[in-house]
Structure formats: C-alpha cells, structure tokens
Regions:
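Pyridoxal 5′-phosphate
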Residues: 1-280
C-alpha cells in the first residue's frame, strides 16, 4: 500500500538536496567550528554561509541578527525569557489564547513568577480583534507582545506586521515577538520591509524540509533582549553550545530550495481550488 502523507504542517520529510548538503558535516567535516586549527575552519565557514543565507531569505537582514537554535520551542523560550530579562521594570505580557504550547506554557510560567499576562481571544473564525489588541497594550508596563503569524490548528493568518507597527507606535519600548513556525516558506516575510517592526521571530527546520533538531531566532539589532541559554561564546554569545553544523547547513539549504520553488509551489497549490466548479 502506498502512503499518501498529508500532514506537512506537523513535520516534513528531509529534502534530498538538504540531506546531500548535510552529509559532509556528518562524515568528514565533523570538526568543532570553535576550534582554531585549520580543519575546523571549514565547518566555521559553513555556519557563516548558512547565516548569510537565512539573513537573505528574510529580506536581507544582518547575518549577525540570526541565532541558530535546536528548535522553535527553544527559540520561543529564548525570545520570551530573553525579552523579559532585558525589561525587568515591566511585568506585563500580551499574547493570544490560541498560541502554540511553546508560547502558552511559557506565559503560564511567567504568571507563576509574578508577571501579568493578557490572553487575547479570537472570534468564531479564529481571527483576532485589532481593537482589543490596542486596548491591551499598556505604555510603560507592557514588556512583550508575542503573537504567532499563522495558527498551527486553524491556519488563520494574524496581521503580525500591522500589530507590530501598532505596538511600536503605542510604546517603542515594547518588544514584539512572532512565532512564524507555520508560515516560514509559505508566506513572504520581509523583516526589512513590511515586518520591520518585528523584534524577534522564531521558526523551525522540520516544518520546511530540513531535519528535526534545528531552528533559528531572529533578534533585531538594538532590540531589548538578553541571551537565554548561557555558557560558551557560540552564536556571538547569544546561544551557548557547540553548533550543530550539519543541521544548520540543512536549514539554510531548505530555505534556498523554498525560495527557488515558491512561485511554482504556490501555482500548483492554488490550481486545484481554481478548477473547482463554482455554485451558480
């Protein structure tokens, strides 16, 4: 029996091109990229190249604004706890009631630690009320807004670019984070253009035909944020731990593939719906 897999929003198969790009760093180029000897410089250059690729994908942000992590859950934790560590005078967080558990459970932990969290409801269509969002913001008190870009259960797309703009116009001191795990490669995200008010963005590799066990966090230069995972100097001191070179290379290759096939993929996906008979 032939398996027809229709759950790519849960996880994806590693693309053959991604696996091919990864293999050298699992077999021959296995050196620690932090080491000073010559063989280790290859993996170090591979990470630097991957960082540039990811930066280009998001509209040409600075490569040093990309922090590689182990997954979107780590990225979300790093974004939220890091923003609050850098804004200790503010104790209020705004999020939605329909976030992924990687955000919701962090917010519940924040409440146990004494923070106040506003959970914005959605309507029967899963959409967010922008007016309620504006009312929830508290200038001088709100440290962080964390709102997903696309919901992992309903598929509803939240107007993150607009919400980030509103938050910054209300209070430039508010840090805006979005979990873009379900939207990266499916929707355009230009962090130098429409999404320029977003401070922190997280996503994962296994949703985009890269392997499980790798993700990234965009940290805009100048954003109020402090590192979450402490230890060594890796990732510019923003995420300690020896880098997973092969998986980082795979993540970047997956984004390259997505960028090169986006128009064709969108045409192919939209064609069946365009061909459906319409009611008179």
């Amino acid at each position: 029996m032939r398996l027809v897999y229709a759950d790519n929003n849960a996880t994806t198969r590693v693309a053959p091109e991604v696996l091919e790009a990864m293999l050298p760093y699992l077999a021959d180029e296995y050196f620690n990229p932090s080491s000073m000897y010559e063989p280790a410089q290859g993996p170090a250059r591979a990470i630097a190249g991957a960082r540039r690729t990811v930066a280009r994908f998001f509209g040409g942000v600075r490569p040093d604004e990309i922090v590689f992590t182990s997954c979107a859950t780590e990225s979300n934790n790093a974004a939220i706890f890091g923003a609050l560590r850098a804004n200790r005078g503010r104790r209020h967080v705004v999020t939605t009631a329909v976030e992924h558990p990687a955000v919701l459970n962090v917010c519940r932990e924040l409440e146990r630690e004494g923070h106040e969290v506003t959970y914005l409801p959605v309507d029967s269509s899963g959409r967010l009320d922008t007016v309620a969002f504006v009312k929830a913001l508290r200038p001088g008190e709100t440290a962080l807004v964390s709102i997903m870009h696309a919901n992992n259960e309903t598929g509803v797309i939240f107007p993150v670019a607009e919400l980030a703009r509103i938050a910054k116009e209300t209070d430039p001191g508010i840090v805006f984070h979005t979990d873009a795990t379900q939207s990266v490669t499916k929707l355009p995200i230009d962090l130098t253009g429409e999404f320029r008010h977003v401070d922190l963005l997280s996503f994962s590799g296994h949703k985009i035909h890269a392997p499980k066990g790798v993700g990234a966090l965009f940290v805009r230069r100048g954003a109020r944020w402090r590192p979450f995972l402490l230890g060594g100097h890796q990732e510019g001191g923003r995420r300690a731990g020896t880098e997973n070179v092969a998986f980082i290379v795979g993540l970047a290759r997956a984004l390259e593939l997505a960028a090169s096939t986006h128009e064709e993929d969108e045409r192919r996906i939209r064609l069946p719906s365009a061909c459906r008979p319409r009611a008179a």
